Design a protein with these regions (language model features):
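C-terminal catalytic region of ATP-dependent kinase domains
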Residues: 6, 43, 129-215
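Conserved ATP-binding subdomain of kinase catalytic cores across diverse folds
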Residues: 1-97, 101-119, 123-124, 130-137, ...
Length: 215
């Protein structure tokens, strides 16, 4: 893994890297633990939450978070996420307004963020790649035990939760996969299960009556 450049506009140290394995090559985003800025409400180790988000997306059969793993790099342990070749002028709001055929993908992202307790779903954290696939990125501040949801995705508020989403959320009420739970504290795992139960019992996407749950 070789660092190419530092990514601009990131609050933590974030690097574009080239990854080589035999004849295979790709680019990734490397976020080392040493480059994290201290936060009052999250312990150090945001890189592990990036990996947990990917593992949760896989466990829920959503496939909306790019492949993300723990790796040792030039600046020590960090997360490495597959680099998405995104259409740069697309974001959540443009996709919602102009691509109704992708609304189900956005609904899945909305449900994922509730279960993961995402505190930072900005419009630019929703990508559209050159193959017209929707991706969710930047999950370092997810999975807090206290409910901290902050997101721009409120357009589906009040809609009935689709059965296909209920089917992938309900199993989390009983058990959180080890690939996720081993990256979180026991309190965070229990809170994840409570959020899964809450959205399933409610049967609908929540409405933000306060107008304050935005990143």
């Amino acid at each position: 893994m070789e660092i190419v450049s530092r990514m601009p506009y990131s609050s933590n140290a974030t690097f574009l890297v080239n990854i080589t394995s035999g004849d295979a090559q790709c680019q990734g985003i490397y976020k080392p633990l040493k480059g994290e800025r201290p936060l009052w409400d999250f312990e150090p180790g945001l890189h592990k939450r990036e990996v947990a988000a990917y593992e949760l997306s896989e466990a829920m059969s959503m496939d909306i978070v790019p492949p993300t793993v723990l790796r040792e790099g030039q600046f020590g342990e960090g997360s490495v996420q597959f680099f998405v070749n995104a259409v740069l002028d697309e974001h959540y709001f443009s996709i919602y307004e102009n691509r109704p055929e992708l609304h189900d993908c956005l609904r899945a992202m909305c449900a994922f963020d509730i279960v993961a307790n995402n505190t930072d779903r900005k419009g630019g954290h929703c990508l559209l790649d050159t193959a017209q696939r929707v991706w969710a990125i930047d999950h370092g501040v997810c999975f807090a035990a206290d409910f901290k949801l902050r997101t721009v995705i409120w357009e589906f508020g009040g809609e009935e939760l689709p059965q296909e989403l209920r089917d992938v959320i309900e199993p989390l009420v009983e058990s959180v996969p080890l690939n996720v739970s081993t990256l979180l504290t026991s309190d965070e795992v229990f809170a994840l299960q409570e959020r899964a139960q809450w959205i399933c019992e409610g049967g609908a996407f929540p409405i933000d009556k306060t107008g304050s749950r935005y990143p």
